[in-house]
Amino acid sequence: MKQQRQLRRREADETAELPADLPPLLRRLYASRGVRSARELERSVKGMLPWQQLSGIDNAVEILYNAFREGIRIIVVGDFDADGATSTALSVLGMRALGCDNISYLVPNRFEDGYGLSPEVVDQAKARGAQLIVTVDNGISSHAGVAHAKTLGIPVIVTDHHLPGDTLPDADAIINPNLRDCEFPSKSLAGVGVAFYLMLALRTFLRDKGWFDERNIAPPNLAELLDLVALGTVADVVPLDANNRILTWQGLSRIRAGKCRPGIKALLEISNRDPQQLAASDLGFALGPRLNAAGRLDDMSVGVALLLCDNLGEARVLASELDALNQTRKEIEQGMQAEALILCEKLERSSETLPGGLAMYHPEWHQGVVGILASRIKERFHRPVIAFAPAGDGTLKGSGRSIQGLHMRDALERLDTLYPDLMIKFGGHAMAAGLSLEEHKFEQFQQRFGELVTEWLDPALLQGEVISDGPLSAAEMSMEVAQLLRDAGPWGQMFPEPLFDGRFRLLQQRLVGERHLKVMVEPVGGGPLLDGIAFNIDTTCWPDNGVREVELAYKLDINEFRGNRSLQIIIDDIWPL
């Protein structure tokens, strides 16, 4: 039932003006990812976009400066994912380093409070003595919460990166690169990136006002927060444009050098990751899921506490707690995925083909895991997916993931225009969105969503593609090139890790674990013998001892085991020839 994906080779921009001393392979890879100049390859902090281009930031720092001077209580209100946790921790640590003593934080509980600065969350902040609320990674759609804070006399600064609606909340200051009047060139900052920029602007403002001189303290080195910026940016799967690559590279470099928070060190240990060899993908696939598990199954306050703590022993205890939650999440997800595949089979049987957009619901699914489920089903069937779970009181909460060619939030906005009573609320980005609706309206939503996607999407986009960087020569299949590629990142969303294709003789094949295919291959045209592994293989097709030759889509990788390093390939797709 899994779709067979088609291979397509990426095309390079022939007009790109890249440095002449770049190896030809890197020139090809960068040019095919839209890099047109050496400036876009800058990885030092001097290449960062200036904070002055963020609209609303001057107003925000003035409010914070006055709050610092008056000693009023600041409450940072975060979100229950990895971006929200890193944003919250960064803001608290940053303001403490800048000289604010009266600061605390509050992270809404996914199950009790829902997303964002709701009136109920404002009441919680008020109960904790809030005299100023600063939202991070949320707030742009919190009209009711901001209005409620106003009635209580609590000013609100909104920092967010989610797409705004037609109207903005009546906050005292709003910083969001996606505001219509904001000239900040990068629209891809994560919530933690916006929070970091606010700290940079605040430091400059405080320095100009003589704040540090008055207190006889040195302005803090805010680069110490870049490990959190890198983790939140990669974990939130925002596009790694030139500016986000700088932020991520700088954070990765600090982690590799051992200059990171104890909480990040503890996450690395429990994930069995070597800090010195850390790649951006490790942040997304090892650290991020463990941090996210707190918000998915329990309370993200555990994750924020981990990132804030200064003691490695305490951090290890908290990281162990997150690791256990992540294991539980995996078990829940596995069961939900099996149920989702049964639903897909029923849909296929009823209409011969799957709808262009899948909306699925099961009364026993877990609210905190539907986002991952939607992502898994999207990858399997290559079409937009929204998965729903019960939220109590006869309502459902859904999480959607999209494919290239369909802007998920725009699609929901169109549905809301066509059918105003269909959804209770919605929000999100191009590739991910969240929504809620009444349970009895699910079948209507399922039908309308499928129809809209079918109308909007070119059917060709539903045929899964493997986009390759082409073949490697035998000489390029080496440890040196693998290391070159590792160092050439950071790779990530919209700046994908290099993927190559080629024909190989299949010399050995066997299953390891339950679903991983271990192989030894040799390039058909000659070249080195290569060990390879394909994760989560379709075990109804592999191993197949009748297959002697295959076409592979693969990544060049370095396998590190017990101090030894060897060349291997990570196989994304395998086609028998």
Regions found by a protein language model. Give the residues of each.
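A short acidic, amphipathic alpha-helical/loop segment
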Residues: 144-148, 373, 480
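Mid-to-C-terminal polyanion-binding domains and interfaces
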Residues: 3, 69-70, 314-360, 393, ...
